[in-house]
Amino acid sequence: TIFKLASEGLGNKAYIHERNLKYGSDIALGYVASQRTWGDTDVITPEMVARSGLRWYKNRVVVNYDMDAKNLLKAQPADSEDGINKLLTMSYVTASRLLLANSFGTLDAEHVYKLSRIYPFHQFARSARPLDAFTTDYPRVYGMKLTDKWSSLTFFNEDEEHPQKISIKLSGIEGRGGAGLHPDKQYYIYDFWNDKLIGTFGGNETLEQELRKGEARQMAVREVESNPQVL
């Protein structure tokens, strides 16, 4: 392929970008460093999130996905911070590159601060997987185990007009409605953007949250220890 020729000619220090998944093929994997999962756009939609999210097993492993540039000033819903929080969260969770459509001169201090909350993107070859991929009509829960005692959990309300209850069984099979935690252990769950401790839960319990319209709730899950912990 043309990507093989480019890779061989430019060498292993080059980063080759495959323009668009629409015209892309797995035949280019191993030669391209990144791949677009959507056409030209500067917004984020539920369809974009799902397209990248359901390819979690490839993302950061064999290729880096991006959903084209994102305009922070167009984030929806626009009447709360949930819009930009959602844009940043789901770009991080379901892609592995965030291209800005804005120059820094158009962003205020709060925008720059929020950007700083998600950078740097992690570099290891693993992405959050949709934990409800085979049990719901649309993937709304993403999880990634960072260590044996620390996991990342993301609830995503794709509806920008109405709140929505989202839940996940903390133990159980990942991808089939479970988060894969140990049923006999206790866990602290901390809400990142809302900056609060949600509570302590048994691994055999179900976590249910009511999300505001268009909210992405990013949570840290830590196994309870007998010593003070940073959540």
Say what each PLM segment does.
Residues 3-109:
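Glycan-recognition surfaces
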Residues 5-6, 79-80, 87, 138-143, ...:
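Generic recognition of flexible, low-complexity loop/linker segments
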Residues 23-28, 99-101, 106-113, 160-164, ...:
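Flexible loop/turn segments at secondary-structure boundaries
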Residues 88-133, 225-230:
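Aromatic- and carboxylate-lined catalytic core of secreted/periplasmic carbohydrate-active enzymes
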Residues 91-94, 99, 134-181, 220-222, ...:
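Carbohydrate-binding surface patches
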Residues 106-121, 169-176, 180-192:
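Active/binding-pocket-proximal capping segment
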Residues 184-206:
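Solvent-exposed beta-strand/loop surfaces of large extracellular or lumenal domains
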Residues 200-231:
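C-terminal beta-strand-rich structural cap/linker in extracellular carbohydrate-active enzymes
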